[in-house]
Amino acid sequence: LIRIDVTKRNGLGQFGGRTRHLTLVGTAGNHQIDIANWGGDSFRRAFGLRSDWYRFPDFVAGGFWVAKTNGSVLALGSAVHYSDASSQTLGSPVAAMAVTPTGRGYWLVTVGGDVYAYGDAAYIGAMSGLALNAPIVGLAAHPDGNGYWLTASDGGVFAFGSAAFYGSMGDVALNKPVVGMEATSSGNGYWLVAADGGIFAFGDATFHGSTGHLRLNQPITSMTIAPGGGGYWFVAKDGGVFSFGNATFHGSRGNRTNRRPIAGMAVTTTGGGYWLVMDDGTSFPFGDAPDYVSNTAGPTVVAIDAVPLPPG
């Protein structure tokens, strides 16, 4: 036995609710256990467990960070906490975060354009003290770790360090505001996503599809690219997930009654799963995403980012 993954829960309660499917991963292959209800939980009965509300924290594979508007950062799984801005007096709330390519550091950016760097993340520049036409909503790191981009809700893009400017929507009237951005794996392009799921691709970023022509139940809150950059996911405020290109759909919260809005998502290093995270930090794993108790973060979570694959 290598590990045990909880691959489905009923979505009710702490760390995603009661267990409804397990994958036992072993050297000779995988074994699936489908669990219809408490009485039908063969795993629980075999080990004498008194509840079907369980998890396996000893099997740590991957992880993610969540950032809050006050600058605090919580690390889950294999993610490491490299300090944060919670002890500082911020000029404006934190809006986004980005992890360094090594996974040993991260940047935070505020809506006013201030940038804070931790771990092996280098401070390369910011929009501090400059008059912005619209608040900053997104941050994307260059793959070489020596630059980053900021984007504002009006589609304006600001490039620092090795990150080159490939265009923006700053001078275009948008149907809905931009809510996030992602960089291509080469660092020679980026995508912007709007609240209606409209996608704007620049440089070598490929357009794989969008929801800009659809009527969404709730606005998009963030996007995440698939490993290798051949696709991307959007997540909406109600937990709806939309996949494009080679990004695979592993499930969503779109058909559930959520007690809090979904703030964002993070994708596993394999691309075989993802976490959806509410604005109080509660996470819901899908696919091969491990299960973590992340609701200790508390309210005002605004950004989520996953531990990356090691360079090379």
Where are these regions (language model features)?
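Conserved, single-site charged/polar hotspot
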Residues: 1-62
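Trp/Gly-enriched beta-strand/coil motifs that build multi-repeat beta-propeller-like domains
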Residues: 60-312
